[in-house]
Curated annotation (Swiss-Prot):
One of its GO terms (cellular component) is membrane. This is UDP-3-O-acyl-N-acetylglucosamine deacetylase. HAMAP family: LpxC. Zn(2+) binds at residues 77, 233, 237. It catalyses: a UDP-3-O-[(3R)-3-hydroxyacyl]-N-acetyl-alpha-D-glucosamine + H2O = a UDP-3-O-[(3R)-3-hydroxyacyl]-alpha-D-glucosamine + acetate. It comes from Nitratidesulfovibrio vulgaris (strain ATCC 29579 / DSM 644 / CCUG 34227 / NCIMB 8303 / VKM B-1760 / Hildenborough). It is an enzyme of class 3 (hydrolase). Its EC number is 3.5.1.108. The active site is at residue 260. GO terms for molecular function: metal ion binding; UDP-3-O-acyl-N-acetylglucosamine deacetylase activity.
Length: 308
């Protein structure tokens, strides 16, 4: 399977989740073996950051990368789109210190990348494959990874809210199945949003880019895009956070109520024990499967909402 990049540069702008100000982003093609890199405009010039577990400096509201005085926040939805479409090499130019939040999902980034076009390169795709079972747990939340020739996620969430409850999703992540999760938006609770705004945080958060819930209902006038949009978004976040390994990660991941902090802790553990749990693999062209033979998305939702 060959590495890929985009065919041409493409730009967008939008609101930054943290600052509430307009930020600008340009996606550029990149040479083979570049990987995903962020070129961040700062007062001292352009600083480059390549995603890896150790450069994650914050996991509160979103995943933030930082290095040498430069940082870029809210990277996970863009990274999920890049990984979901199996793009290996791309340069992300950022003005404003954040990836724009857009509508709170990855749908706009998928549209941008598809509009830019995807170009096959010459070199073989490099991946890290889970070599043996590994379990990571903290405070009752966990990630279990098993060897698997692909990227499969089984995710469970549980929230004491009548519209969420317990939800599960099982999906093989491919360019064909990624649409199952790409449109799922980030979500939060009204009491949390009000508190964050009072502290000058999440100033760009609104009903335009997040699902907001009170104690019983969704406040967004158009409601949910699917009853299990919540777990779909958690899978989206997980795909984006797993992109921090620098090259695609293959395995079967069974995830219980994780979040950005646990995802990053899991990756740091893998990186520190790479000789035990990871196998570096090149996927030659001969291993590429026709799209029609790729695994389809498999969705299973438990605990249908008590309130429709």
């Amino acid at each position: 399977m060959n590495q890929t990049t985009i065919k041409k540069s493409i730009a967008c702008s939008g609101v930054g989740l943290h600052s509430g100000k307009t930020v600008r982003m340009v996606l550029h093609p990149a040479a083979e073996d570049t990987g995903i890199v962020f070129d961040i405009h700062t007062a001292q010039g352009v600083r480059r950051i390549a995603p890896e577990p150790q450069v994650v400096i914050a996991t509160g509201l979103a995943t933030t990368l930082g290095m040498d005085g430069a940082s870029v926040a809210t990277v996970e939805h863009l990274l999920a789109a890049i990984r979901g479409l199996e793009i290996d090499n791309i340069t992300v130019e950022i003005e404003g210190g954040e990836v724009p939040i857009m509508d709170g999902s990855a749908a706009s980034f998928v549209m941008l990348l598809r509009n830019a076009g995807i170009r096959r390169q010459t070199s073989a795709r490099k991946v890290f494959r889970i070599a043996r079972p590994v379990h990571y747990e903290r405070d009752g939340k966990s990630i279990r990874a098993l060897p698997y020739d692909g990227f499969r996620v089984e995710y469970r969430i549980e929230f004491p809210h009548p519209l969420i409850g317990r939800q599960t999703l099982s999906i093989d992540i491919t360019p064909e199945s990624f649409g199952e999760i790409a449109k799922a938006r980030t979500f939060g609770f009204l009491r949390e949003v009000e508190y964050l705004h009072s502290k000058g945080l999440a100033l760009g958060g609104s009903l335009d880019n997040a699902i907001v819930l009170d104690d019983y209902s969704v406040l967004n006038p158009d409601g949910l895009r699917s009853p299990d949009e919540f777990v779909r978004h958690k899978v989206l976040d997980f795909v984006g956070d797993m992109a921090m390994m620098g090259v695609p990660l293959q395995g079967h991941f069974i995830v219980e109520c994780s979040g950005h902090a646990l995802n990053n802790g899991f990756l740091r553990m893998l990186e520190e024990n790479a000789s035990l749990y990871l196998e570096a693999v090149e996927l030659p062209v001969a291993e590429q499967h026709p799209a029609a033979l790729r695994p389809a998305a498999r969705v299973a939702t438990e605990g249908q909402p008590a309130i429709a």
